[in-house]
């Protein structure tokens, strides 16, 4: 007999690691998570979906506008099956379920990332001018019936020379 199992970055670093840390915590008030990735590593479709290379006005219309709606409108889009959440949207739901919590609300906000000087993108075959979107931060906030808030953010963008992939999580509570 043979068992083959597979897993990925989200499963380990956004899920199992956090639930293990939470299990060792006496009291949790808030879970804060942030993960960064370079859109240059994942191709043109991902770079464009993250708004890389757009002006801030274009970003607002093409990327952020879908999150600047009422909770009722968002729920209707979710119910229709047409909502396109960020990676963290599903992670928050998974963590809430894994921790035995109950969601009372969940929101997402896509915020453009910029840089103070021009950055070249090989993927987009362009120089992204200072102040244009290099990508985005998608911030997902989940409130639970039990009083625990999850605030997670995935940052996908064209990196400057000093930027790098990172995964940072904080559990606020006791111990802090």
Residue ranges, per PLM feature:
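Beta-strand-loop-alpha-helix segment that lines the small-molecule cofactor/substrate pocket
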Residues: 1-7
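Active-site-lining helix/loop region of Rossmann-like oxidoreductase modules
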Residues: 21-172
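Gly/Ser/Thr-rich loops at beta-strand to alpha-helix junctions
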Residues: 8-15, 38
């Amino acid at each position: 007999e043979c068992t083959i199992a597979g897993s990925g970055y989200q499963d380990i670093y956004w899920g199992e690691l956090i639930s293990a840390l939470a299990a060792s915590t006496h009291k949790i008030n808030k879970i804060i998570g942030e993960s960064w990735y370079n859109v240059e590593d994942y191709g043109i479709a991902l770079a464009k979906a993250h708004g890389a290379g757009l002006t801030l006005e274009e970003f607002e219309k093409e990327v952020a506008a879908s999150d600047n709606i009422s909770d009722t409108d968002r729920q209707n889009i979710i119910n229709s099956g047409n909502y396109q959440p960020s990676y963290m949207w599903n992670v928050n739901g998974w963590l809430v379920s894994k921790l035995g919590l109950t969601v009372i609300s969940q929101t997402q906000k896509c915020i453009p990332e910029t840089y103070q000087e021009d950055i070249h993108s090989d993927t987009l075959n362009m120089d992204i001018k200072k102040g244009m979107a290099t990508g985005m931060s998608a911030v997902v906030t989940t409130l639970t019936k039990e009083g625990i808030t999850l605030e997670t953010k995935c940052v996908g963008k064209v990196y400057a020379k000093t930027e790098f992939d990172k995964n940072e999580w904080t559990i606020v509570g006791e111990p802090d």
